[in-house]
């Protein structure tokens, strides 16, 4: 049986031998997880404090880089467990976030996930590269999202796809945008 050839006369094997990855740069892939803690009417959001650069000491969503041997869902589960101690199978995709300048380390595309848990049953334990992991009270009023853990208050307005911080403290990366998108889906 003859091998199928493309318009350049190459078989698939020949094409793959000549294929140049550098002609098509690949982004780094990450998963970020918005963990909403519910207990009755009370809502909380689980954040980690970054232990390293970039954005050292800033609050962020749990998440991290994907390995070539895992799916994005597996990355989300692994990173959530490694950084916070939360082991939850209940995650659902929020969306893909791919602005070219969203991460100072380079072209990083993240698949964001939503995870809903009962926060009274999930103790936050910092691990891996997270310096700290804490539940923040979550309030949403007039398109203003406020996160408060008693020591730090992060407040921002989300309107027409844009984030405007009200507080001095901010979240790392584009995590305010990801949180706002998750809240829209609740």
Predicted regions and their residues:
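A short coil-to-beta-strand element that immediately follows conserved catalytic motifs
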Residues: 87-95
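Acidic, metal-coordinating catalytic segment for phosphate/diphosphate chemistry
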Residues: 1-32
